[in-house]
Amino acid sequence: CTQLLRQALTELLKQPLLLGVSAINDPYFDENGALVTLKADNSHAKVALAGVMLAKLYLMLNKIIHDKHIELTRFALPAKVGVSDEAQTDAMTQLLNSVSKKEQMLILLPNAGLKQIGSYVQVQSVKRPTTVYERECAVFDGGSDAMMQRLAEVRNSVLTTESNG
């Protein structure tokens, strides 16, 4: 899982659209999942978009791996992912544990982040929210054709690298 996530991150950050975005940490999985911290190296960097794209890319990769493991009667868990700014990390962890469903992406970003991803993704609200965070949280509901095509290409590149490595 860790190797797959790192490879996905490396391949994704090569995309011209995400120029100026870099990872602060070297992500790894533990009993709580994995955390990737991204930063903007300049004012034009689309760090919120990079977070959403990485989350979706990981879901796409995990689905393939999960389905393959099930087919081979091996144990595998479906993934849940969340995208937030650093200030909302704890809130996102709570949301992932309370309202997130398998193979779903939750997004908890300030308005500037939501504006940045607005022309690339569609979101919906959490159904029947009971907390402030649940009201502020968005659920990924699809991406633009161009973004999804780009992610499919990156996914294929990661899978090709994985099978050769």
Residue map of PLM features:
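Catalytic NTP-binding/metal-coordinating core of nucleotidyl cyclase/transferase enzymes
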Residues: 1-50
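A short glycine-enriched loop-to-beta-strand structural element that forms part of the catalytic core
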Residues: 21-39, 67-89, 106-109
